From Swiss-Prot:
SUPFAM superfamilies the UniProt entry points to: YejL-like (SSF158651)
Protein name per the record: UPF0352 protein CGSHiGG_07710
Family assignment from sequence similarity: Belongs to the UPF0352 family.
Transmembrane segments: none
Organism field: Haemophilus influenzae (strain PittGG)
InterPro entries: UPF0352, YejL_sf
Amino acid sequence: MAQHSKYSDAQLSAIVNDMIAVLEKHKAPVDLLLIALGNMASNLLTTSVPQTQREALAQAFSNSLINAVKTR
């Protein structure tokens, strides 16, 4: 989603490829996969981000996701 990052393309690709492999393993429908990814994002926000920053980060993530699907 992000075009500029402090992380290398290799780091991001490795994580994304691992996540795709897990999702494909379960052969679940797209809506279930999106629910699982949404739950994972929510969990990361609530367990790893200070409460004062959660809503702003969730909004930034949402905006980035929307922009990513608009350009494809």
